[in-house]
Amino acid sequence: MRPDTSRDPVAGPDSGPEPPFPIRLAGPVIKGFGRGSKELGIPTANIPADGLAEYPDLQVGVYYGVVALNPAQSEVPSTSAQILPAVLSIGYNPFYKNTTRSIEIHIMPPLTAPSPTATGTPGHVTFHKLPDFYGTSLKLLILGYIRPEYDYVSAEALIEDIRVDCEVARRSLQRGAYVRYLGAGADENEENEEVQEQRRWLTTF
């Protein structure tokens, strides 16, 4: 059960990702359990979990990072050739008692756009939604860990915690050492080679 404590406003050090991050995962967007969007109102893009075999020590929980969709496959114009912020869960979702580990990614709007999850009351939160893009190749770069998985007393409590996760992810990615992975915040000549290489990987399909 989720502890009754206040949430930290950001996750990860201000200096930038530390090992094991960044973590690369990729795969086609597949159908999940269908509950994120239908029951919770939180659209997610699921990718196969077999890529986690390379990271056997990665704990289950909620993470943040950046994603890119193959523009040749995606019919979502706003994502074409873009790297977008994301919050994701890796694990079993104790609230639904899943027995199969999954990777569920919620793609957020660009950091320059207003945040749909900045405010809200339980049960009345609006999350960013894109048209379905099943089968589209997706690349994910995980940059930090937010919190463990928890069980919840209600769906409303789960939704509120995910809303806060989105805001923690946004604030974390707005910091200088992280926003560069989105292609913002610095002149390319001033960026280190590692960040440039990660961005090239994200956008090369």
From Swiss-Prot:
Cofactor comment: Zinc or magnesium.
Please name the catalytic residues of this protein.
104
Any idea which UniProt keywords this protein has? ATP-binding, Flavoprotein, FMN, Kinase, Magnesium, Metal-binding, Nucleotide-binding, Transferase, Zinc
Q: Which GO molecular-function terms appear in the entry?
A: ATP binding; metal ion binding; riboflavin kinase activity
Where is the stretch described as Disordered? Answer: 1-24
Cofactors needed by this protein, per the record, are: Zn(2+); Mg(2+)
Pfam families according to UniProt? Flavokinase
Job description of the protein:
Catalyzes the phosphorylation of riboflavin (vitamin B2) to form flavin mononucleotide (FMN) coenzyme.
Q: What is this protein called?
A: Riboflavin kinase
Tell me the gene name: fmn1
